[in-house]
Amino acid sequence: MPKMKTCKSARKRYAFTSKGKVKYKKQNLRHILTKKSAKRKRNLGKSGLVSNVEVKRIKTLLPYV
């Protein structure tokens, strides 16, 4: 049976914590930052956690993590 392939786009976007949770970097912090408030930019800089509903789907995209 052939090896399962890792979804390369998912590999770049998600990282697993030691307890098995999935974290990601939030969007909207690349350009057009002048109209965004300091509070919004500060919160966008923090990494977020994926909800438990979507973790199973991400694990199918990343079989060897």
From Swiss-Prot:
MF terms (GO), sorted A to Z: structural constituent of ribosome
Entry-linked InterPro entries: Ribosomal_bL35, Ribosomal_bL35-like, Ribosomal_bL35_CS, Ribosomal_bL35_sf
Highest taxon listed in the record's lineage: Bacteria
Tagged with keyword Ribonucleoprotein: yes
Gene3D superfamilies referenced in this protein's UniProt entry, alphabetically: 4.10.410.60
GO cellular component terms attached to this protein's record: cytosolic large ribosomal subunit
GO BP field: translation
UniProt keyword terms in alphabetical order: Ribonucleoprotein, Ribosomal protein
Recorded family membership: Belongs to the bacterial ribosomal protein bL35 family.
Listed NCBIfam families: rpmI_bact
Name of the protein in its database record: Large ribosomal subunit protein bL35
Upper taxonomic lineage: Bacteria, Pseudomonadati, Spirochaetota, Spirochaetia, Spirochaetales
Encoding gene per record: rpmI
